[in-house]
């Protein structure tokens, strides 16, 4: 009869090979240990189904220990509905049962179900959670960015006696970080000193900083980790977060340190880490290094191609970006909506208007991507940069967008109006932004500048006073530059640093050499894209422009960085046209390559020209 039962079980061809093993081993040993062992080994649904049948036939359906292993096996196989059905049929589910299903919902991308299970765990037949339960529910809160629920569960944790568990505390740090509550995450992290921190807890805190635009703290904490007397080594997740922080800040030197650790740790073949490195080098202004990383990636994906296309686009290499896109499609890697955004961005920043319009028209038919407001906004930007402002304006009026995307749309049109001296377009775009309550400060400033260009200094000043009364404060312009292991930050007009005298003398000497070559400064360039909109004499305007933060950073770099090395400057705002023209000439005078990353793109100055070709 036993033989008949086994032979009547329907198995996939691969699992039928195991039947003789069951006849000899299982029925000989007659222990549930055999079942549990086989369940832990199972990687096949048919195999687990067979074991499930045997469990029922042999009377283990009411054995919590055995059924838990069945639940865990189904969870591993992504069969969460079957796992949940088994759980619901259990007579006495214990903490392992509950935690397994909660974890399963997390793995299937259903964090809301995981939290519902946790709530049910306390309501039906209260079962005290263990450290793995708490870690799983904090993971669910992280996925949903639910800080309110997370704090309530944190309160339960405090009275559970498990607060000092390193697994739970690490997941708690991660949860607060993903909920944008970095201060609370740091308090939890600091409290772990008393009972130990491991590479997971360090990674969680570094990632919290990196993901919340606090790259400086991420790098400093990474330095502390390296200095700590611990046997732990940075893993690929920590390194990816550090590399991301270096990308956002333009910290090339620390990015290279992280790259060295990636190599020593053997993570270069990890696609996520390699793509992070590619992105870091590109955003730090070292496109050649980014290209080397790209060429080393063995198995390319849409992510690696998209990152490289975006990098080339930001550096003004539109033709190269388009060529790479064609190579990707020829290699049968399907683009996604981000890839096509990158292609349109490349066309916009390189003056490839006809090509960009063609890609837009073919997106749905040829590439299977329906263009949305983000793609149309990119086309508005492209038309505006090329001087086809009226077409850009007409297109902008037809696009249906929400408030946030609308800010990007009208912000692009505002930039086009400023660039091409279209005061009426600047005025219209600014008013729409102010009405939408998005990018209000930049809109006020642009509208004020538009009044100033047309000679309406009183209207301009009145608008700036209104801006102050409404609490909108212009972000202070700053530039920073790396020298060895340090970063030097400069603000416009600020000469309070130790080298201020030397920098000021150097800039005046540069200004003299520029004028000898015909440079006439800001007084010859007063348009809506100029940078000085104050009713002062021309000499004072030139003085104000000469102390812009990017010029101060440039002077420092030329004075202190090794001769012949590339000067890399990061800027938190858009580079002004006056400085852009000056940098082109300076690159020729000093015979140095100068790379400036502003809020929109990279400008690579060399031999008197810029890679943007003035499409910016």
Swiss-Prot record:
Source domain of life: Eukaryota
One GO process term, biological-process aspect: RNA modification
The UniProt record lists the keyword DNA repair: no
Keywords, alphabetical: Repeat
Region (Type E motif): 409-484
Pfam families: DYW_deaminase, E_motif, PPR, PPR_2
Start and end residues of each stretch annotated as Type E(+) motif: 485-515
Signal peptide: none
Region (Type DYW motif): 522-616
The PPR repeat ranges on this chain: 63-93, 94-128, 130-164, 165-199, 200-228, 235-269, 270-300, 301-335, 336-371, 372-402
InterPro entries: DYW_dom (IPR032867), E_motif (IPR046848), Pentatricopeptide_rpt (IPR002885), PPR_At4g14850-like_plant (IPR046960), TPR-like_helical_dom_sf (IPR011990)
GO terms of molecular function: RNA binding; zinc ion binding
Protein family per UniProt: Belongs to the PPR family. PCMP-H subfamily.
Protein name as annotated: Pentatricopeptide repeat-containing protein At4g15720
Organism: Arabidopsis thaliana (Mouse-ear cress)
Lineage: Eukaryota, Viridiplantae, Streptophyta, Embryophyta, Tracheophyta
Primary gene name: PCMP-H1
